[in-house]
């Protein structure tokens, strides 16, 4: 969702985990985690909105962001990045039956809403919004930009 280079994520896993074996790690990272193989390993991207994270974990307790909002000052960065991912990859995801509902929901957004999501996602990537505000996504993760 953040738009980092999947190959750099793969290289990072190999570098930091002593027990990482490339023949296992590569398909898991590029295929399942990053969906960089276009759906060979996984049938849909492993992405989630802030609402899903809130429902499934305690990580949102005390957070100032609202997982129900996709844009605006109070929008959860995960919600923003989720919708931005769908916007950026709408054409490719439209061919995936498991993503049909999400793609239809993207199509329902007004142009102004789409623009607001894209602008906020860009601000998140620049490090202007989020838990590491002031640190770009590249600096925070160590991974370069990708589509």
Model-derived features with residue positions:
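C-terminal catalytic domain of photolyase/cryptochrome flavoproteins
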Residues: 1-147
């Amino acid at each position: 969702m953040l738009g980092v280079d999947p190959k750099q994520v793969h290289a990072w896993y190999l570098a930091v985990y002593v027990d990482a074996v490339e023949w296992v790690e590569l398909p898991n990272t590029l295929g399942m985690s990053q969906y960089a193989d276009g759906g060979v390993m996984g049938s849909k991207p492993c992405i989630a909105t802030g609402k899903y994270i809130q429902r499934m974990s305690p990580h949102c307790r005390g957070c100032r962001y609202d997982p129900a909002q996709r844009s605006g000052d109070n929008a959860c960065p995960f919600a923003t990045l989720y919708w931005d991912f769908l916007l950026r990859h709408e054409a490719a995801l439209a061919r995936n039956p498991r993503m049909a509902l999400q793609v239809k929901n993207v199509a329902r957004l007004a142009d102004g809403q789409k623009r607001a999501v894209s602008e906020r996602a860009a601000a998140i990537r620049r490090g202007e919004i989020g838990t590491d505000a002031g640190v770009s996504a590249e600096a925070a993760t160590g991974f370069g930009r990708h589509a």
